[in-house]
Structures are given as C-alpha cells and as structure tokens.
C-alpha cells in the first residue's frame, strides 16, 4: 500500500505525530465540477449548450459560497459507445460566473469534438481555483466592461435566489431542456 499504508498503520497504532489541526482550519478546494448522464443522447450542439449551462449553475453557486474563482475549465464527455474524452483550457480572466464558465466550456467542446457519436454524459469542472478576493489583471484588448457586468448581474441573481427561492431566477434556456434527467429543481439542491 506504499506510504499511505505505512501512515495508516502508524495512525491505527497511535503513532500519529502530526500537529492537531484547528477547528477553523479551511482547506480550499482545487477544483469544482458537476456532471450528468442525460435521459437521451445529446445529438445537437444546442443540447450540449443547455446541459453545460445547467451544470455551470451549480458550479457558479459553489464557487460563490466558497469565495473562489476559476482560472480554467475542463470538459469531460462520454459518447453513446462509452468512449470518454477530456479537454481543458485556461481562462483569460478568473471568473465565478456560471455563464462565463458555460461559454468557455462550450467553446472548448465545439473546437475539440467532431460529433463522431451522440453524447451520453457531460461533466464540466472549474479548475485552477483562486480566491475571489485576489486582484485580477485585465487585458486592454478585451471587453472588460461586459465581463464585469456579467459578474455583477450574476451576483444580483444569486442574492435574489438566496433571499427568495433557488428557482426564482433561472436562465430561460433551461426551461425547455428535454434531454436532461428529471429534476425537482434546476439549480443546486435539486440534484
């Protein structure tokens, strides 16, 4: 069992000499992801976009709760022949926005997948997480105003969801999604 086996044996025999961890000790997550197997195979890019948008709603919510942003995104797909493929990329600006994560994931998917087979499952993962309080270096050539507006808009939407109901604000695209499994809610808590 290697070094973990040795550590397990030492702990089981009371030979643990590591310092006691404080109760408020918080170990930040290194990645956050969410995936789903759909009720029927995804055959169009629109189906994949809707699925990714749904998945990133959960990821964005968890990033907000943990006060983190993603500096990268990873996409894992499994087709109807159960072949798995995975891609990842860095984001130009770290984000906690579910729509920005969905756009990056979908762009990565579109540029990498050739639609050899319909898709059975999709997983989106926010990677290279950083603190939300960390300053961000902006690029003068990008549309930073639109990026900031999207971040602020989603922050307001999350505040409304926290105050009233998790389903009080839902992207309209998710209201017509047929390919996904039955859920009691579109957002976290209904999984």
Give, region by region, the residue ranges found by the protein language model:
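Acidic, metal-coordinating catalytic segment for phosphate/diphosphate chemistry
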Residues: 91-191
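DNA-contacting surface of Y-family translesion DNA polymerases
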Residues: 1-116
């Amino acid at each position: 069992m290697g070094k973990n086996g040795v550590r397990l044996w030492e702990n089981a025999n009371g030979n643990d000499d590591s310092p006691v961890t404080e109760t408020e000790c918080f170990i930040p997550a290194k990645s956050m992801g969410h995936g789903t197997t759909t009720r029927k195979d995804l055959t169009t890019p629109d189906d994949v976009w809707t699925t990714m948008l749904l998945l990133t709603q959960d990821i964005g919510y968890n990033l907000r709760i943990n006060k983190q942003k993603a500096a990268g995104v990873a996409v894992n797909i499994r087709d109807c022949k159960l072949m798995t493929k995975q891609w990842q990329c860095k984001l130009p600006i770290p984000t906690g926005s579910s729509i920005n994560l969905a756009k990056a994931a979908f762009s990565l998917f579109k540029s990498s997948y050739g639609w050899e087979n319909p898709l059975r499952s999709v997983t989106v993962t926010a990677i290279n997480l950083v603190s939300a309080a960390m300053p961000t270096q902006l690029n003068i050539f990008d549309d930073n105003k639109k990026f900031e507006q999207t971040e602020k808009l989603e922050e307001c939407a999350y505040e409304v969801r926290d105050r009233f109901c998790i389903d009080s604000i839902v992207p309209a695209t998710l209201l017509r999604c047929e390919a996904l499994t039955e859920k009691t809610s579109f957002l976290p808590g209904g999984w």
